[in-house]
Swiss-Prot record:
Gene Ontology CC: cytosolic small ribosomal subunit
Role played: Binds as a heterodimer with protein bS6 to the central domain of the 16S rRNA, where it helps stabilize the platform of the 30S subunit.
Xref: Pfam families: Ribosomal_S18
Annotated GO MF terms: small ribosomal subunit rRNA binding; structural constituent of ribosome
Keywords: Ribonucleoprotein, Ribosomal protein, RNA-binding, rRNA-binding
Name this protein carries in UniProt: Small ribosomal subunit protein bS18A
Length: 84
């Protein structure tokens, strides 16, 4: 006997369109010295959050990643967190 393939399709969740914060606010710049801004894009473990999580556009997500890496190099941000 073959199994029947009559599964119900999962209900579709409404997709919320997120706008890039930096595209919306043209005057806000991404700088490696602005650690308060950069900490919002870093997880508790010290990883850079993904674009689908932050809602940034491609260019600004790249700029955030470069700024975080530069801030880590000059010891403004830690490479990893101390929580284990």
């Amino acid at each position: 006997m073959a199994k029947s393939n009559k599964r119900r399709p999962a209900p579709e969740k409404p997709v919320k369109a997120r706008k890039c914060v930096f595209c919306a606010k043209k005057d806000q710049a991404i700088d490696y010295k602005d650690t308060a801004l950069l900490r919002t894009y870093i997880s508790e473990r010290g990883k850079i959050r993904a674009r689908r999580v932050t809602g940034n556009c491609v260019q600004h997500q790249r700029d955030i990643a470069i700024a975080v890496k530069n801030a880590r190099e000059v010891a403004l941000l830690p490479f990893t967190s101390s929580a284990r």
